[in-house]
């Protein structure tokens, strides 16, 4: 029994049975140990950013951590952007990184780096066992740290000699992380929130811990009883949506519009969320989105029991059941492909219980409204703003769930983690990839104006346009073993979506869109 086998045995004892891996030399004993770990599903990813994003997606749909397997500091660096998204999503994730042998580090070999410093920037705990005998206990501590609350990215750095070294006396029972319950909200804050909801113009602001159907139902009851509007953060980790589900008002992404959206509020009650702030700074636009006379009540910030907070407010307000708004999904569209017809096609065809991994960016401007009364589904969004999340998260969601996953990908973002297509094909995952190809970084056209950057000459245009050459997304998909279709009309898109949903395994649909949104 060596350190690597001890790590795997402890993972299995704690229910961590999926590993998204891009291994190197330092991880070979872990890889070898997988041959005997029949309870573990090991998934090869061709780029570390796919592995980390897949672990994020898996956690979003299961509520449980998957593990990554990364190679030294550069492997961690390659996967860091999607670990950042996982940090912002507040999902549990066990980030396993192989390191040089403990005695080799002092020689400053080419791949030597300060792994703990890079991992520490994720704001989660970092564990570094120095003996094979320490691996099991440190792994259990890391898994406990991943669960939180709040959930976090927990990193375990495994030196090569600790991995291959023998455990002198394996434990009779592998250590199991003790679960920790989220603290309940402060009674005084509950009373304050209830009083202000009754007496001031208010909103309940829901974060990712409060976006299940049952908790949004409670929020709807509170809103109906108090007159407060129910809002949701711009980019929730996972959100139940569709017909029969409460539809909170989504905070607008653009800061100046979000400021106007919140301007008349005197109270903002936070449930599972932090206070909203601008995504970026802009000239003459405040970073803080609520007005100066708005009282923000942090009733249940991340890590505090959001369900208990909502239930307490229901009791305080004696809030009766409230009707859920009803409506119908759009009809299948025809005619030209536009951002509106694309959104309508998704809404009209979406199968029940689908999972929507949404990195449509500017091309998805109509998506939230169009899918309000689509078939019930789960929405996964770009929590941390680091693009290249949609395809990897779709991989993890498909492995963690039996539902059809629909990955909506803008063309620029797709090129960050294109290797995820290969993993979809190899694992035969039921993922429909919809590439929204407007052939430019369209968001930057808009942002250039917003920040007051002048000029639109040839040099700046070359940094925003995705042409010369035009990317053949269908060709790229086929090269990785995925059937692909290029559509020309909205009717074609509807047909292609329906065929995809009826066919096992992955497929890709390329949707050409106008460059302006």
Where are these regions (language model features)?
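Phosphate/pyrophosphate-binding active-site segments
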Residues: 2, 133, 157, 171, ...
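Active-site diphosphate/adenylate-binding microenvironment
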Residues: 4-17, 22-26, 30-35, 324-402
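A general structural motif
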Residues: 47-48, 105-109, 179-194, 251-252, ...
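Residues that mark the start of a beta-strand
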Residues: 65, 201-203, 355, 378, ...
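Thiamine diphosphate
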Residues: 96, 104-113, 225, 366-517
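Short conserved AdoMet
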Residues: 151, 198, 263, 291, ...
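Generic enzyme active-site microenvironment
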Residues: 231, 357, 408-409
């Amino acid at each position: 029994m060596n350190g690597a086998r001890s790590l795997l045995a402890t993972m299995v004892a704690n229910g961590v049975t999926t590993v998204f891996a891009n291994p190197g030399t330092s991880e070979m004993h872990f890889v070898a140990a997988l041959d005997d770990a029949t309870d573990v599903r090991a998934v090869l990813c061709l780029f570390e950013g796919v592995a980390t994003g897949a672990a994020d997606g898996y956690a979003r749909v299961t509520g449980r951590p998957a593990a990554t397997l990364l190679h030294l500091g550069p492997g961690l660096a390659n996967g860091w952007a999607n670990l950042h998204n996982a940090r912002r999503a507040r999902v549990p994730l066990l980030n396993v990184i192989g390191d040089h042998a403990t005695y080799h580090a002092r020689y400053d070999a080419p791949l030597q780096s300060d792994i703990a410093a890079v991992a520490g920037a994720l704001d989660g705990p970092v564990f570094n066992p120095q003996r094979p005998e320490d691996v099991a206990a440190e792994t259990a501590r890391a898994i406990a740290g991943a669960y939180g609350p709040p959930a976090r990215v927990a990193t375990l750095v495994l030196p090569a000699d600790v991995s291959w070294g023998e455990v002198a006396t394996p434990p009779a029972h592998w250590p199991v992380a003790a679960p920790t319950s989220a603290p309940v909200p402060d009674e005084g804050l509950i009373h304050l929130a209830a009083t202000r909801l009754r007496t001031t113009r208010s909103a309940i602001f829901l974060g990712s811990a409060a976006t299940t159907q049952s908790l949004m139902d409670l929020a709807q009851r509170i809103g109906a009883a108090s007159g407060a509007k129910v809002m949701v953060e711009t980019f929730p980790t996972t959100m139940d949506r569709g017909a029969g589900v409460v539809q909170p008002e989504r905070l607008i992404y653009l800061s100046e519009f979000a400021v106007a959206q919140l301007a008349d509020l005197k109270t903002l009650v936070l449930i599972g969320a932090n206070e909203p702030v601008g995504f970026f700074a802009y000239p003459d636009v405040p970073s803080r989105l609520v007005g100066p006379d708005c009282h923000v009540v942090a009733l249940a910030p991340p890590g505090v029991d959001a369900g208990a907070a909502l239930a307490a407010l229901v009791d305080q307000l004696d809030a009766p059941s409230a009707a859920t708004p009803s409506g119908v999904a759009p009809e299948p569209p025809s005619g030209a492909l536009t951002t509106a017809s694309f959104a309508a096609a998704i809404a009209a065809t979406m199968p029940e219980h689908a999972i929507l991994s949404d990195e449509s960016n500017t091309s998805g401007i109509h998506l939230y409204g169009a899918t309000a009364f689509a078939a019930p589904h789960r929405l996964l969004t770009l929590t941390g703003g680091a693009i290249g999340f949609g395809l990897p998260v779709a991989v993890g969601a498909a492995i963690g769930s039996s539902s059809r996953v629909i990955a909506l990908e803008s063309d620029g973002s797709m090129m960050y983690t294109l290797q995820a297509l290969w993993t979809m094909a190899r694992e035969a995952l039921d993922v429909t990839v919809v590439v929204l190809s407007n052939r430019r970084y369209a968001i930057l056209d808009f942002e250039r104006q917003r920040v007051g950057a002048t000029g639109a000459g040839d040099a700046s245009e070359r940094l925003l346009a995705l042409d010369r050459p035009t990317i053949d997304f269908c060709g790229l998909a086929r090269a990785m073993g995925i059937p692909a279709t290029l559509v020309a009309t909205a009717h074609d898109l509807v047909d292609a979506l329906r065929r995809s949903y009826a066919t096992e395994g992955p497929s890709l649909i390329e949707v050409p869109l106008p460059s302006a949104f």
